[in-house]
Amino acid sequence: MAGAPPTDVEECTLETARRELGSYAVPVDRTDRIPLSVAVGRVPATDTTANNRIPGADIGVDDTVFERGHQLRPADVGLLKAAGVSELLVRQRPQVAIVPTGDGVVEYDAGPEERVETAGFTLAQYADRWGGKVTYRNAVADDAPALRMAVQRDLTRDIVVLTGTEPGDTLRAVVRELGDTVTDRVAISPGRETGLAVVQNRPVLLLPESPVAARVGAVQLLRPLLKGFGDAPFSAHPTREATLDGALDTDRAVRSFVPVALDGETATPLSGTDLATATRADGWVTVPDGEANPGAGDTVSVEDWDYLP
Protein backbone atom coordinates (compact mmCIF):
# COMPACT_ATOMS: atom_id res chain seq x y z
CA MET A 1 0.00 0.00 0.00
CA ALA A 2 1.27 3.48 -0.82
CA GLY A 3 1.79 6.17 1.76
CA ALA A 4 3.02 6.30 5.31
CA PRO A 5 1.84 3.53 7.63
CA PRO A 6 -1.01 4.56 9.92
CA THR A 7 -0.60 4.99 13.65
CA ASP A 8 -2.18 2.54 16.06
CA VAL A 9 -5.07 4.94 16.69
CA GLU A 10 -6.31 5.04 13.11
CA GLU A 11 -9.53 3.23 12.33
CA CYS A 12 -11.46 2.38 9.19
CA THR A 13 -15.07 1.45 8.59
CA LEU A 14 -16.11 -2.11 7.83
CA GLU A 15 -16.92 -1.15 4.25
CA THR A 16 -13.43 0.31 3.76
CA ALA A 17 -11.83 -2.78 5.31
CA ARG A 18 -13.75 -5.07 2.97
CA ARG A 19 -12.84 -2.95 -0.04
CA GLU A 20 -9.14 -2.89 0.87
CA LEU A 21 -9.01 -6.66 1.40
CA GLY A 22 -11.19 -7.37 -1.62
CA SER A 23 -8.77 -5.56 -3.92
CA TYR A 24 -6.35 -8.47 -3.37
CA ALA A 25 -8.93 -11.24 -3.82
CA VAL A 26 -8.07 -12.29 -7.35
CA PRO A 27 -9.72 -15.67 -8.03
CA VAL A 28 -7.16 -18.45 -7.80
CA ASP A 29 -6.10 -19.82 -11.18
CA ARG A 30 -5.16 -23.24 -9.80
CA THR A 31 -7.55 -26.00 -10.83
CA ASP A 32 -8.27 -29.65 -10.06
CA ARG A 33 -10.17 -32.28 -12.00
CA ILE A 34 -12.35 -34.13 -9.51
CA PRO A 35 -15.02 -36.85 -9.63
CA LEU A 36 -18.62 -35.71 -9.44
CA SER A 37 -19.07 -37.61 -6.17
CA VAL A 38 -16.96 -35.05 -4.25
CA ALA A 39 -18.05 -31.91 -6.11
CA VAL A 40 -20.63 -30.53 -3.65
CA GLY A 41 -19.52 -27.10 -2.47
CA ARG A 42 -16.93 -26.71 -5.21
CA VAL A 43 -16.89 -24.01 -7.89
CA PRO A 44 -16.44 -25.03 -11.56
CA ALA A 45 -13.61 -23.21 -13.32
CA THR A 46 -15.44 -23.38 -16.66
CA ASP A 47 -19.03 -23.63 -17.83
CA THR A 48 -20.34 -27.16 -17.27
CA THR A 49 -22.00 -28.66 -20.35
CA ALA A 50 -24.18 -31.72 -20.81
CA ASN A 51 -22.83 -34.88 -22.42
CA ASN A 52 -26.30 -36.42 -22.64
CA ARG A 53 -29.75 -35.04 -23.30
CA ILE A 54 -31.96 -34.89 -20.21
CA PRO A 55 -35.54 -35.77 -21.17
CA GLY A 56 -38.08 -33.38 -19.69
CA ALA A 57 -35.44 -30.90 -18.53
CA ASP A 58 -35.01 -29.00 -21.80
CA ILE A 59 -31.26 -29.69 -21.66
CA GLY A 60 -29.56 -31.09 -24.74
CA VAL A 61 -26.05 -32.26 -25.56
CA ASP A 62 -23.48 -29.45 -25.21
CA ASP A 63 -25.99 -27.17 -23.48
CA THR A 64 -24.64 -25.26 -20.50
CA VAL A 65 -25.98 -26.80 -17.29
CA PHE A 66 -24.15 -24.49 -14.87
CA GLU A 67 -22.03 -21.45 -15.59
CA ARG A 68 -18.55 -20.91 -14.24
CA GLY A 69 -18.62 -19.62 -10.66
CA HIS A 70 -21.72 -21.53 -9.58
CA GLN A 71 -21.19 -23.19 -6.20
CA LEU A 72 -22.50 -26.72 -6.56
CA ARG A 73 -25.28 -28.03 -4.30
CA PRO A 74 -26.30 -31.68 -3.76
CA ALA A 75 -29.19 -31.42 -6.22
CA ASP A 76 -26.86 -29.90 -8.81
CA VAL A 77 -24.59 -32.93 -8.93
CA GLY A 78 -27.64 -35.14 -9.42
CA LEU A 79 -28.59 -33.10 -12.47
CA LEU A 80 -25.03 -33.27 -13.77
CA LYS A 81 -25.01 -37.04 -13.40
CA ALA A 82 -28.21 -37.21 -15.44
CA ALA A 83 -26.43 -35.07 -18.05
CA GLY A 84 -23.65 -37.64 -18.32
CA VAL A 85 -21.04 -35.63 -16.43
CA SER A 86 -18.71 -37.78 -14.31
CA GLU A 87 -15.96 -35.31 -13.45
CA LEU A 88 -15.44 -31.57 -13.28
CA LEU A 89 -12.67 -29.00 -13.61
CA VAL A 90 -12.96 -26.89 -10.46
CA ARG A 91 -11.00 -24.07 -8.90
CA GLN A 92 -8.74 -25.13 -6.10
CA ARG A 93 -9.91 -23.88 -2.75
CA PRO A 94 -8.07 -20.72 -1.66
CA GLN A 95 -5.35 -21.49 0.86
CA VAL A 96 -5.57 -19.80 4.25
CA ALA A 97 -3.12 -20.07 7.14
CA ILE A 98 -4.50 -19.54 10.65
CA VAL A 99 -1.79 -18.79 13.19
CA PRO A 100 -2.63 -18.27 16.89
CA THR A 101 -0.17 -16.10 18.80
CA GLY A 102 0.56 -15.22 22.41
CA ASP A 103 2.49 -16.37 25.47
CA GLY A 104 1.08 -19.22 27.50
CA VAL A 105 -1.18 -20.46 24.70
CA VAL A 106 -1.26 -24.26 24.40
CA GLU A 107 -3.24 -26.78 22.38
CA TYR A 108 -4.39 -28.93 25.32
CA ASP A 109 -3.85 -29.51 29.05
CA ALA A 110 -3.26 -25.93 30.12
CA GLY A 111 -1.19 -25.57 33.27
CA PRO A 112 -0.89 -22.61 35.63
CA GLU A 113 -0.60 -19.32 33.72
CA GLU A 114 -1.55 -21.12 30.48
CA ARG A 115 -4.73 -21.22 28.40
CA VAL A 116 -6.00 -23.52 25.68
CA GLU A 117 -6.09 -21.93 22.22
CA THR A 118 -9.66 -21.81 20.90
CA ALA A 119 -10.14 -18.72 18.72
CA GLY A 120 -7.88 -19.86 15.87
CA PHE A 121 -9.02 -23.47 16.10
CA THR A 122 -12.67 -22.44 15.84
CA LEU A 123 -11.97 -20.10 12.93
CA ALA A 124 -10.21 -22.93 11.10
CA GLN A 125 -13.48 -24.88 11.13
CA TYR A 126 -15.40 -21.90 9.78
CA ALA A 127 -12.82 -21.17 7.09
CA ASP A 128 -13.06 -24.76 5.90
CA ARG A 129 -16.84 -24.50 5.69
CA TRP A 130 -16.56 -21.21 3.80
CA GLY A 131 -14.50 -22.92 1.09
CA GLY A 132 -10.93 -22.42 2.25
CA LYS A 133 -8.13 -24.98 2.36
CA VAL A 134 -6.93 -24.40 5.91
CA THR A 135 -3.52 -24.78 7.50
CA TYR A 136 -3.94 -24.42 11.27
CA ARG A 137 -0.65 -23.78 13.06
CA ASN A 138 0.45 -24.28 16.64
CA ALA A 139 0.52 -21.09 18.70
CA VAL A 140 3.55 -18.83 18.33
CA ALA A 141 4.94 -17.07 21.42
CA ASP A 142 5.14 -13.29 21.71
CA ASP A 143 8.70 -13.16 20.39
CA ALA A 144 9.61 -10.96 17.43
CA PRO A 145 11.93 -13.41 15.59
CA ALA A 146 9.48 -16.29 16.05
CA LEU A 147 6.55 -14.19 14.87
CA ARG A 148 8.52 -12.94 11.86
CA MET A 149 9.33 -16.51 10.83
CA ALA A 150 5.71 -17.56 11.33
CA VAL A 151 4.38 -14.83 9.04
CA GLN A 152 7.03 -15.41 6.38
CA ARG A 153 6.45 -19.18 6.45
CA ASP A 154 2.84 -18.81 5.35
CA LEU A 155 3.24 -16.19 2.63
CA THR A 156 2.86 -19.06 0.15
CA ARG A 157 -0.84 -19.12 1.14
CA ASP A 158 -3.45 -16.83 -0.38
CA ILE A 159 -4.49 -15.41 3.00
CA VAL A 160 -2.80 -15.24 6.40
CA VAL A 161 -4.90 -14.92 9.57
CA LEU A 162 -3.21 -14.21 12.90
CA THR A 163 -5.16 -14.34 16.17
CA GLY A 164 -4.33 -13.09 19.65
CA THR A 165 -3.18 -9.63 18.58
CA GLU A 166 -4.07 -6.03 19.41
CA PRO A 167 -2.79 -2.59 18.40
CA GLY A 168 0.68 -1.83 19.72
CA ASP A 169 1.77 -5.40 20.43
CA THR A 170 4.86 -7.21 19.16
CA LEU A 171 3.05 -8.89 16.28
CA ARG A 172 1.73 -5.62 14.88
CA ALA A 173 5.27 -4.20 14.92
CA VAL A 174 6.60 -7.29 13.11
CA VAL A 175 3.89 -7.11 10.45
CA ARG A 176 4.57 -3.41 9.93
CA GLU A 177 8.25 -4.20 9.32
CA LEU A 178 7.40 -6.94 6.81
CA GLY A 179 4.75 -5.12 4.82
CA ASP A 180 2.13 -2.38 4.87
CA THR A 181 -0.41 -1.91 7.63
CA VAL A 182 -3.78 -0.83 6.25
CA THR A 183 -5.34 -0.15 9.63
CA ASP A 184 -4.91 -1.17 13.25
CA ARG A 185 -8.61 -0.92 14.04
CA VAL A 186 -11.93 -1.56 12.30
CA ALA A 187 -15.10 0.20 13.46
CA ILE A 188 -16.91 -2.95 14.60
CA SER A 189 -17.84 -4.24 18.03
CA PRO A 190 -16.80 -6.64 19.31
CA GLY A 191 -13.55 -6.81 17.37
CA ARG A 192 -12.56 -3.16 17.18
CA GLU A 193 -8.91 -4.22 17.65
CA THR A 194 -9.02 -6.07 14.31
CA GLY A 195 -6.19 -5.02 12.00
CA LEU A 196 -5.47 -5.37 8.29
CA ALA A 197 -2.13 -5.56 6.53
CA VAL A 198 -0.57 -6.61 3.24
CA VAL A 199 2.72 -8.51 3.14
CA GLN A 200 4.23 -9.44 -0.23
CA ASN A 201 0.85 -8.86 -1.88
CA ARG A 202 -0.84 -11.23 0.58
CA PRO A 203 -3.75 -9.96 2.69
CA VAL A 204 -3.11 -10.43 6.41
CA LEU A 205 -6.00 -10.36 8.86
CA LEU A 206 -5.08 -9.55 12.47
CA LEU A 207 -7.73 -10.72 14.95
CA PRO A 208 -8.10 -10.36 18.73
CA GLU A 209 -7.85 -13.37 21.04
CA SER A 210 -11.44 -13.09 22.28
CA PRO A 211 -13.46 -15.88 20.60
CA VAL A 212 -16.46 -13.61 20.06
CA ALA A 213 -14.38 -10.72 18.67
CA ALA A 214 -12.36 -13.05 16.45
CA ARG A 215 -15.53 -14.65 15.13
CA VAL A 216 -17.09 -11.28 14.30
CA GLY A 217 -13.94 -10.20 12.48
CA ALA A 218 -13.75 -13.46 10.56
CA VAL A 219 -17.42 -13.51 9.53
CA GLN A 220 -17.32 -9.90 8.38
CA LEU A 221 -13.90 -9.94 6.68
CA LEU A 222 -12.49 -13.43 6.13
CA ARG A 223 -15.68 -14.96 4.74
CA PRO A 224 -16.10 -12.47 1.87
CA LEU A 225 -12.36 -12.59 1.20
CA LEU A 226 -12.44 -16.38 0.80
CA LYS A 227 -15.43 -16.13 -1.52
CA GLY A 228 -13.54 -13.62 -3.65
CA PHE A 229 -10.46 -15.82 -3.95
CA GLY A 230 -12.64 -18.84 -4.68
CA ASP A 231 -14.76 -17.02 -7.30
CA ALA A 232 -17.76 -18.24 -5.30
CA PRO A 233 -21.04 -16.36 -4.80
CA PHE A 234 -21.18 -14.30 -1.61
CA SER A 235 -24.66 -14.74 -0.21
CA ALA A 236 -26.19 -12.98 2.77
CA HIS A 237 -26.87 -14.97 5.91
CA PRO A 238 -30.49 -16.06 6.29
CA THR A 239 -32.47 -14.03 8.81
CA ARG A 240 -35.55 -14.45 10.94
CA GLU A 241 -37.60 -11.91 12.85
CA ALA A 242 -37.65 -12.05 16.64
CA THR A 243 -38.75 -9.89 19.55
CA LEU A 244 -36.12 -8.72 22.01
CA ASP A 245 -36.77 -9.47 25.67
CA GLY A 246 -34.05 -7.03 26.72
CA ALA A 247 -32.56 -3.82 25.37
CA LEU A 248 -29.29 -3.86 23.42
CA ASP A 249 -26.43 -1.75 24.73
CA THR A 250 -23.99 -0.84 21.95
CA ASP A 251 -21.58 1.93 21.00
CA ARG A 252 -23.22 4.18 18.41
CA ALA A 253 -19.81 5.10 16.99
CA VAL A 254 -19.29 1.64 15.48
CA ARG A 255 -21.28 -1.11 13.79
CA SER A 256 -22.18 -3.62 16.49
CA PHE A 257 -22.98 -7.32 16.32
CA VAL A 258 -24.86 -8.71 19.31
CA PRO A 259 -25.17 -12.47 19.93
CA VAL A 260 -28.64 -13.62 20.96
CA ALA A 261 -30.25 -16.84 22.15
CA LEU A 262 -33.56 -17.71 20.51
CA ASP A 263 -36.59 -19.26 22.18
CA GLY A 264 -39.32 -19.45 19.60
CA GLU A 265 -39.80 -15.87 18.40
CA THR A 266 -38.03 -14.31 21.40
CA ALA A 267 -34.38 -13.18 21.29
CA THR A 268 -32.36 -12.80 24.48
CA PRO A 269 -29.14 -10.74 24.22
CA LEU A 270 -26.02 -12.53 25.45
CA SER A 271 -23.25 -10.69 27.23
CA GLY A 272 -19.57 -11.60 27.34
CA THR A 273 -16.82 -12.25 24.82
CA ASP A 274 -15.81 -15.76 25.89
CA LEU A 275 -16.14 -19.06 24.07
CA ALA A 276 -19.35 -20.01 25.88
CA THR A 277 -21.07 -16.84 24.66
CA ALA A 278 -20.09 -17.52 21.06
CA THR A 279 -21.27 -21.12 21.36
CA ARG A 280 -24.65 -20.32 22.95
CA ALA A 281 -25.53 -17.77 20.27
CA ASP A 282 -28.34 -18.90 17.97
CA GLY A 283 -27.92 -15.78 15.87
CA TRP A 284 -26.60 -12.23 15.70
CA VAL A 285 -28.31 -8.83 15.58
CA THR A 286 -26.60 -6.04 13.66
CA VAL A 287 -26.88 -2.47 14.94
CA PRO A 288 -25.47 -0.03 12.34
CA ASP A 289 -23.32 2.80 13.59
CA GLY A 290 -25.23 5.96 14.38
CA GLU A 291 -28.51 4.15 15.05
CA ALA A 292 -30.33 3.98 18.36
CA ASN A 293 -30.22 0.71 20.28
CA PRO A 294 -33.29 -1.52 19.90
CA GLY A 295 -35.16 -1.91 23.16
CA ALA A 296 -37.12 -4.66 24.85
CA GLY A 297 -40.19 -5.49 22.79
CA ASP A 298 -38.66 -4.29 19.53
CA THR A 299 -38.61 -6.59 16.51
CA VAL A 300 -35.14 -7.31 15.12
CA SER A 301 -33.62 -9.36 12.31
CA VAL A 302 -31.48 -12.22 13.60
CA GLU A 303 -28.77 -13.53 11.25
CA ASP A 304 -27.80 -17.20 11.28
CA TRP A 305 -24.01 -17.17 11.05
CA ASP A 306 -23.78 -20.97 11.14
CA TYR A 307 -25.69 -21.36 7.90
CA LEU A 308 -23.86 -22.99 5.01
CA PRO A 309 -22.34 -21.89 2.72
Residue ranges, per PLM feature:
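Structural beta-strand/beta-sheet cores of well-ordered domains, especially the beta-sheet scaffolds
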Residues: G41, D63, A75-D76, P94, ...
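Predominant activation on well-ordered alpha-helical scaffold segments within soluble catalytic domains
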Residues: R18-G22, D63, V77-K81, F121-D128, ...
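Short, glycine/charged-enriched hinge/interface segments at domain edges or termini
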Residues: A2-R33, R42-N138, A267-T268, W284-V285, ...
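Proline/glycine-rich low-complexity loops and linkers
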Residues: D169-T266
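Glycine-rich, charged/polar anion/phosphate-binding loops
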Residues: N52, L80-E87, P190-E193, G230, ...
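Short, glycine-/Ser/Thr-/acidic-enriched flexible segments
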Residues: D103-G104, E166-P167, E209-V212, D249, ...
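C-terminal terminal segments
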Residues: A4, A45, I54, G60, ...
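Helix-rich terminal scaffold detector
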Residues: S86, Q92-L206, A214-G217
